Amino acid sequence: MNVIETRALGKSYGSTRALRDCTLAIPDGHVVALVGPNGAGKSTFLNLAVGLATPSAGEVTVLGGLAAGSLPALDGIAFVAQDTPLFKNLSAADLIHMTRNLNLRFDQGYAEHRLGELGIDLEQKAGKMSGGQQAQLALTLALARRPQLLVLDEPMAMLDPLARHDFMATVMTAVADDGVSVVLSSHVLAELERVADYLVLVSRGRVQVAGEVNDLLATHRVLTGPAAQAGRHLQHWDVVHASCAAPLAEVLVRGYATCEPMPPGWDAHSLTLEELTLAYLREPDAAALPGPARTHSPGTKERTK
């Protein structure tokens, strides 16, 4: 089952195209890192998936084919946004009561127990809580709905490192205990690397990279060798990003197997998710998507083989 699937999805705000020609299938059972620069279309994509916006073109379905925003879809998805929208004048107990009345599957016992573990007073008003406590309260209310899919849009942006760690610990406990699928948008790449097993990179309103992290890392390598020899090799490699400053060239390639045997004086090194992501962000015309292989050299348009 795909928890989110899009076909030629697009969204425009007036003359501004926030998302264009997005075709993507995210399978269930993953913690998905949704990354990209500011204004790339990440929040637009998530808003379309959870039914807070309607497409200008194409379609989006969730949880195995349900129309995004439909009542069955809303019943199976929980969403936490960056600003942790809580009624600041209501206590945690009030918010639990309100959320329970709006959601038939709401697990009040879980919510109260979880907040107790976190040391959050049920009688304290949300507006009097720290940023970390507010984020944990919003996350607890979302998880108590017992969703199949948890969507998180920059929920840790305003949190300190300890609060971010505690927030992600709660998320990963839900993944381990309940099998929740997660789509998490964040700018903190090192943090995502510890938890994500699926990557979706959005750039300039389109999906640039999508796939399981292990597969992406296995098919990409950083090649290093004499800068003077780089030019003769680049045309034969599927190059994502190249830095050829003398004396040593550093080239990130896709389809590493096609580069073997390595030329004399060249070595191949594995890379991290952060290095992979940054390389594609530096080369927005490069892509790594399921389907036909694409070739690209920095400064040129990609082409499909």
Model-derived features: positions:
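Conserved structural motif at the start of ABC-family nucleotide-binding domains
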Residues: 4, 19-21
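The feature captures the beta-strand-to-loop junction immediately N-terminal to the Walker
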Residues: 35-37
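Conserved ABC transporter NBD signature motif
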Residues: 57-73
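ABC-family P-loop ATPase nucleotide-binding domains
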Residues: 81-137
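ABC transporter nucleotide-binding domain
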Residues: 167-254
